[in-house]
Amino acid sequence: PQAPVHLLILPKKHIQSLADVSEDDVKLLGEMLIRVKKLAEEFELENGYRTVINTRGDGGQTVDHLHIHLLGKRKMQWPPG
């Protein structure tokens, strides 16, 4: 884990990466973001949190399925690495 809270939000539908989404996936992506918000509330991340979507090899993606990292419960740094 990269933070005390490190969650992954994945769609059931297989989408390889953010670069592979289509206009048909707009509702699905919105649902994923609403899920992030609800999880942030559930895990009491009221001081803030970071969301990350790594895309393809140079973007740091190592799992070939779209997912959002939700990181919280620590002060985030910039640049991330």
Spans of model-derived segments:
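HIT superfamily nucleotide-processing domains
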Residues: 1-81
